[in-house]
């Protein structure tokens, strides 16, 4: 079976002008495996926080594992949304009944596919914008916000929450804790094993 690929490009403008392209191969029989490209995107996100640390950001999180964990969640969201899109494509084109006998179902599934495409693209663009802002966190920190992490990085965490909500995903699917409490979001970030 031929591989279906979804390309996600991030432009890390605060670091340089070159795009960092990560390809996620989507294989129907292999959907639950971590796909090639995941490590590269995690490293890209990690580099943003390394820059923050190198610039002596006064609110850099002292936990050395946090940056990797946040980057992991961001990457997971992009990967999962891409998989969700490919699931819809597979369902649409593999269902001969829908394709040949039910025009109403064709329209319904088609609209869902269009919505998922928009979600993946817009979510990736917004994530890229937030990551670019995180790159400039030295400026953000001068605002004097009473956060224990840089404002830019904090907004990345908030974006993660927003995207999870938009996907309708259960928080327990992403976190190690069994009894999830929305008030414990920050501690859940710390508990992720990557």
Swiss-Prot record:
Protein name: Uncharacterized protein ORF14
Naturally occurring in which organism (per UniProt): Ostreid herpesvirus 1 (isolate France) (OsHV-1)
